[in-house]
């Protein structure tokens, strides 16, 4: 929920969704772009891990399939289904008010409660789509020896949906306004008997994740050294865009007024349209754009957005 001073005050961002990624003074928004930036700037060839392990099918690059799977299925229809399992009492809390502002219309707890059975049915439909692949032959969702982006995206959404359906996490989600004593409504749909393939995959993935070392570090709010590090980089060049198969299409983007130096607004194409990020267009690529925010924060950064899932518009008379 808002406020998120790290976004607004520190970086000058009106964009309200998390997570974001900062690599030096370059800030990346949306998980889809964050993943590609991490893979590019911290490649396996330098000893880093990857969520695109080698394919077991010689010569087949599945990366585009995994990216589309995560962006167009897991993050959209499957996500909408799992949010429909949130306990109705949550929508009567300040979190519900916040989400109504994000979505752009009011949320009626009683109407949403009446839709839970419908949403459970949709949840089961998604499990049914996954079951044949995981039951018949595949260890993972893509033909790989280790989990890929496809597995990570589905696992997170499925785990979150199962937890939120029984109220786990809603106390924190609602700022302490709703307790965590809900009924486990998802187990009637997702269980070993109905979907043994998905069930086995789910537990296999959890075992794999548990076997990995915990490399996470935490920075307290009192530690501001990282801000000083960014300030020292303000005079340096931006990292630029993550490489794509084809370079920028300047002729096509020019027809839309998307040329370097103009003022643009950037908003998600689903929710959060009321919080546009306005800034000077720095780079324009096929999959990504970067801007220098008009609103100045504590540190001056270059902000990157993916083009899929976002609407970029030039501001009239904005040529600089």
Which residues fall in each region the model found?
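Non-transmembrane alpha-helical segments in soluble domains
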Residues: 35-39, 127, 131, 202-206
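Generic structural signal for secondary-structure transition and capping sites
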Residues: 43, 135, 139, 210-211
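GST-like fold's C-terminal all-alpha helical module
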Residues: 73-201
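Catalytic cores of secreted or luminal carbohydrate-active enzymes
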Residues: 185-248
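Catalytic lobes of large eukaryotic enzymes
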Residues: 196, 238, 252-260
